[in-house]
Amino acid sequence: LNGETEIDYQGEPSRVQAIQNTAKAHVYGFESGIEIDFSVALRLTSQISITEGKEEQEDGSTAALRHAAPVFGNTHLIWHKKRLKFDLFAEYNGQFDYEDLAPSEQGKAYLYAIDDNGNPYSPSWYSLNLTGQYEFSKNLLATASLENITDQRYRTYSSGIAAAGRNLILALRYTF
């Protein structure tokens, strides 16, 4: 655009604007998973993800990267025999203290829990869940899930949405 600050757009003068990433960010992490078969019917699976991120600020200093989540993972104990399957599983998330939050998040008390000093932080949480499935036929599957059995109040990092309390889900699936 040859450095122009305005262009003609459909007969109207329009200001030229650009969103630019002018700083640097460094993100690194580690993800690991394991599967253990105790028997033909019983299996344990677990996954964990650890992410760290730093971004350069306008003054040249570094601070926590907004979208680098705290440690999170899940663990499943699955029993599956013929047409019946049970999955007892936990989902979990680590804590971010006020100092661990990105500067852009530190002023958002409405989005996070408040610590003893009155500062926002993202507390750790877990949910314990149980799902059962029965395959009546090749085409018909029934599922029942009880989620958040311990009725924990939790919020996925930076989502702003608190999870529902205990849930019961019943479903029938028929495939043509």
Language-model-detected regions and their locations in the chain:
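Gram-negative outer-membrane beta-barrel transporters
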Residues: 9-102, 138, 150
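Outer-membrane beta-barrel transmembrane domain signature of Gram-negative proteins
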Residues: 19, 118-121
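C-terminal beta-signal and adjacent terminal beta-strands/loops
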Residues: 1, 92-113, 121-125, 129-176
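Surface-exposed loop/turn segments flanking beta-strands in extracellular/periplasmic regions
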Residues: 2-20, 107-114
